[in-house]
């Protein structure tokens, strides 16, 4: 009898993968074959640059449906950046035996609960990489696209003590779907839980009570695969964890697109949101200019902004690239003029802000 996640995966994965095809490119990754328990039956790929920083950071990268680890790396340019910044990369990879569309099973109860299935396999890989390369345990991060983004949310929820930060691209919040019908509805942006329930889902996933990982959210304003309402739900989920309100501390235009920042009560930046208004479903990349990294392809979308470089900069493990085109110095002040007004107008025009 096939696993429940197999059946669910065929349906949910097909929707997520309708237009997605594997991004091909040079395979710079190696296999990690002995990392301990693997209840999720995942493959582990890794990249270790020739020049490592002392006690390097570790970045875990989770591909989207129909993609491979090597294809995602080629498109997003993570190993390119690792060569410069000296951090280690771990790319868990789905197997077709688990999911015919190569989606991580973010919606299957047996794969999204701590200590079980795919999340447990990824956790074991992280431990093995940390031991093998002397990774700084305070600088472990995770990011992913689409189903990989939703699995990123699951990793952050189940193992918050492991991660300093996460970045979710075109993904969904944790704990909103348990089965095929719910997964499809959430992807359409329907019946998402309220902020309190979203936050409670993360708090209930572990015994952790803080500090919480920081979060970078990226979403296309015209994403027809995972509705942008999921980005707002993610923000609600994590603002609740940090105990901060809806109003951002700062707003800016980056590449003509809204960028919002939230700070905790100590003034530390803990959440950011990049909304690429004219972009559909995929990972934002730049193929030219100072922040060029990776290569364009299916669901590797050249919008002139490298999410890879900017996420790494947000985490503090790579050089900051570029600068905001304009910034509202005090987002708590006048909301209708200047950059803050432009950002809000842009979000409203895209139907992303009431």
Language-model regions, residue ranges each:
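Short beta-strand/loop motif that positions the catalytic acidic residue
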Residues: 217-219, 223
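Short beta-strand immediately N-terminal to the catalytic nucleophile in serine-hydrolase-like folds
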Residues: 142-144, 169, 218
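Conserved alpha/beta-hydrolase "acid-adjacent" motif
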Residues: 225-230, 284-285
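Short glycine-enriched nucleophile-adjacent loop
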Residues: 149-161, 167
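Alpha/beta-hydrolase active-site loop
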Residues: 110-133, 154
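Cap/lid segment of the alpha/beta-hydrolase catalytic domain
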Residues: 93-117, 179-180
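Short substrate-entry loop that stabilizes the transition state in hydrolases
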Residues: 52-100, 176
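A domain-start/cap signature at the N-terminus of enzymes
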Residues: 1-58, 70-76, 84, 114, ...
């Amino acid at each position: 009898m096939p696993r429940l996640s197999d059946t669910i995966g065929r349906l949910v994965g097909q929707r997520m993968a309708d237009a997605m095809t594997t991004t091909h490119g040079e395979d710079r990754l190696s296999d990690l074959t002995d990392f301990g328990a693997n209840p999720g039956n995942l493959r582990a790929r890794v990249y270790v640059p020739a020049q490592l920083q002392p006690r390097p950071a570790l970045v875990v990268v989770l591909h989207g449906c129909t993609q491979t680890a090597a294809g995602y790396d080629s498109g997003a340019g993570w190993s390119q950046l690792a060569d410069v910044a000296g951090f280690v990369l771990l790319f868990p990879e789905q197997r077709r035996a688990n999911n015919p569309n190569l989606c991580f099973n973010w919606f299957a109860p047996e794969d999204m609960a701590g200590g079980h299935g795919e999340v447990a396999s990824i956790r074991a890989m992280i431990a093995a990489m940390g031991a093998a390369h002397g990774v700084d345990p305070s600088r472990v991060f995770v990011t992913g696209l689409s189903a990989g983004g939703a699995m990123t949310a699951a990793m952050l929820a189940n193992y918050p003590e492991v991660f300093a930060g996460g970045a979710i691209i075109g993904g969904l919040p944790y704990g909103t779907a348990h089965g095929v019908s719910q997964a499809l509805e959430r992807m359409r942006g329907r019946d998402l839980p309220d902020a309190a329930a979203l936050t409670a889902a993360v708090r209930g996933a572990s015994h952790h009570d803080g500090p919480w990982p920081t979060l970078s959210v990226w979403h296309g304003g015209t994403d027809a695969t995972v509705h942008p309402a999921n980005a707002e739900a993610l923000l609600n989920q994590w603002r609740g964890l940090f105990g901060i309100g809806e109003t951002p501390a700062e707003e800016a235009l980056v590449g003509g697109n809204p960028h919002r920042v939230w700070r905790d009560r100590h003034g530390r930046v803990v959440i950011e949101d990049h909304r690429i208004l004219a972009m559909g479903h995929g990972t934002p990349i730049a193929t030219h200019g100072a922040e060029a990294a990776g290569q364009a392809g299916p669901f590797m979308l050249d919008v002139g902004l490298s999410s890879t470089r900017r996420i790494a900069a947000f985490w503090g493990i790579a050089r900051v690239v570029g600068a905001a085109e304009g910034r509202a110095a005090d987002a708590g002040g006048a909301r209708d003029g200047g950059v803050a007004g432009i950002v809000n107008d842009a979000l409203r025009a895209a139907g992303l802000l009431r």
